[in-house]
């Protein structure tokens, strides 16, 4: 299995320069490469402080110029918000600029607020995503192609910007049965967020994935999937709870956007407590926060029980410390991972990885 670093690029203080957030994401990506992380992930969201990155493919292209080895990936391209021909060409260009290091993370979207402002239909987003992926696969396997779907039509077309090694590896985000079915049918790697939950939730999601794959007659002994986890390495209780407060902030915004209950004051979303919200103290008991030994023990438990092929760490959340995020990357590589490997052995040999070297 392998590890990644996730960049949401949100902010909590009004007037935060977006340029700073882009630069901090870039520097975390560079450090993640030095620390041996396998993938750097970049989110896409629009129209609020929840996330200031409207184009993860632009972040891929930018970070490709300052890195050499690390894979670069949207998490995710919100497919129905794009014009098909332009999106496909930009995927090909991003892969070329990164010398074939693109992993294409896709999603169908979940925020009505975004879809309304793009004039897009959230109700048909999953079927739109499938049609768009039909077109991507045709564009990168044939010199020319045409398409006549329920949502999209394209006359005979050549996409000139082609990926280095043909079709990029595809990961798909979401925990619904519909997303599972797409992953099974197309051979994509599913990924989901662990949110504020502990290992039991991740195991439950793995079991749901296994059920979907088994229903389709697929072998689940080598099931590959990715999970996103919060990570903050510190011996300070104050820093731990400041970080957890920012995790809760981010989850509150996401929950409000999902439920269509967002309230904005200009660019800033108001924080609305989630239904059945757990306390920061409870969060501290099962998230990957705290000192090196605590995190290593919890991570070992999560890996051994849930057996993910990839874990992406969300290190800088809301208004949490950039410097603490950098420190956490370094301590994960130098101290936490070796402690986990003392118990589980070399993690590159543990479980299943879909990532090609």
Report each predicted region and the residues it spans.
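Active-site mouth loops of central-metabolism enzymes
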Residues: 9-22, 77-85, 164-174, 232, ...
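N-terminal beta1-alpha1-beta2 module of alpha/beta enzyme domains
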Residues: 1-66, 70-72, 167-168, 350-356
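Conserved, mostly hydrophobic/aromatic
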Residues: 3, 36, 44, 63, ...
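An alpha-helical appendage that flanks or caps ligand/catalytic pockets
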Residues: 124-159, 200-308, 341-357
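Flexible, glycine-rich active-site loops centered on histidine and acidic residues
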Residues: 2-20, 80-146, 189-203
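Alpha-helix-loop-beta-strand connector modules within alpha/beta enzyme cores
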Residues: 53-74, 128, 330-343
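Glycine-rich, proline-tolerant flexible connector loops at the mouths of alpha/beta enzymes
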Residues: 39-63, 78, 110, 194-197, ...
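Hydrophobic faces of well-ordered beta-strands that scaffold small-molecule active sites
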Residues: 3-5, 40-42, 72-74, 102-106, ...
């Amino acid at each position: 299995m392998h590890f990644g670093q996730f960049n949401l690029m949100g902010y909590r203080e009004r007037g935060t320069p977006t340029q700073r957030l882009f630069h901090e994401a870039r520097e975390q990506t560079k450090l993640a490469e030095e620390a041996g992380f396998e993938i750097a992930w970049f989110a896409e969201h629009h129209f609020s402080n929840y996330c200031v990155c409207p184009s993860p493919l632009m972040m891929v292209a930018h970070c490709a110029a300052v890195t050499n080895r690390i894979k670069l990936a949207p998490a995710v391209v919100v497919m129905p918000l794009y014009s098909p021909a332009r999106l496909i060409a930009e995927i090909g260009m991003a892969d070329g600029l990164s010398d074939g290091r693109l992993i294409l993370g896709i999603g169908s979207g979940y925020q009505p607020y975004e879809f309304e402002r793009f004039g897009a239909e959230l109700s048909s987003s999953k079927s739109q995503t499938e049609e768009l992926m039909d077109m991507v696969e045709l564009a990168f396997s044939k010199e020319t192609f045409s398409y006549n779907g329920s949502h999209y039509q394209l006359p005979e077309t050549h996409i000139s910007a082609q990926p280095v090694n043909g079709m990029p590896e595809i990961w798909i985000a979401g925990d619904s049965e519909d997303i599972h079915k797409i992953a099974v049918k197309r051979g994509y790697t599913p990924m989901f967020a662990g949110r504020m939950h502990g290992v039991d939730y991740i195991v439950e999601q793995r079991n749901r994935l296994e059920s979907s794959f088994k229903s389709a007659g697929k072998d689940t002994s080598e099931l590959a999937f990715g999970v996103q986890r919060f990570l903050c390495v510190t011996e300070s209780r104050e820093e731990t709870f400041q970080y957890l407060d920012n995790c809760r902030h981010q989850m509150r915004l996401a929950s409000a956007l999902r439920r269509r209950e967002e309230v904005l004051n200009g660019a800033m979303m108001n924080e609305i407590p989630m239904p059945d919200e757990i306390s920061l103290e409870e969060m501290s008991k099962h998230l990957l926060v705290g000192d090196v030994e605590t995190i290593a023990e919890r991570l070992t438990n999560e890996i051994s029980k849930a057996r993910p092929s990839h874990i992406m760490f969300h290190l800088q959340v809301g208004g949490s410390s950039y410097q603490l995020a950098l420190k956490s990357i370094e301590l994960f590589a130098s101290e936490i991972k070796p402690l986990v490997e003392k118990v589980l052995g070399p993690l590159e040999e543990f479980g299943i990885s879909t990532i090609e070297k």
